Amino acid sequence: MTFSVTLVIVAVTVLVSWRAFNDRALMDRLILWPPAVERRKQYDRLLGHGFIHADWMHLLFNMITLYSFGGAVERIFAQWIGIPGFVLFYLSAIVIAILPTYLRHRNDANYRSLGASGGVSAVLFAFILFDPWSKLIIFPIPVPIPAFVFAGLYVGYSIWMERRGGDNVNHSAHLWGAAYGVLFTLLLEPQVFTHFTQRLLHPSGN
């Protein structure tokens, strides 16, 4: 059986989240609470929040998505920067994706954020660069849609909901995670852009 660091990340996240569900002190220590970063210098929260989730549905949605697409991205990245490089990509995505949120709410004692969505979005959008015509099943759409169509819908919806607000979802982290996934991949291997456009224009080509 081939070793999968994606599966290790999923397992660690599930274990930490499960523990935090039953340990309020752990949840409070890892959650992104901006004043704790700003005043207490608890910078680990910028990463730690990505390993805890609000509930089982939140956790399962993120981890199923990560497991579904992480393996393919891991294998490609491993050829370029090794397995540690892929791990660094995922962990740094969690941090980068939350930074705009932290800066916006740095003095807001009532704001909290948690979840792996920033890192998961980065992995998903890196995958879309590699295979834009891959079919994705997205609730509540009843039929599979091409990955690049999903990407457009995802970005548009996230921008709209970020401006609208009121649903207790950190859409900013989704957007910045997606942007980081694309930028990191293209900086790592600029030829991916050519591959993406060729695949987009010639879906049946090799």
Regions found by a protein language model. Name each.
Residues 1-206:
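A detector for small-residue-rich transmembrane helices and their helix-helix packing motifs
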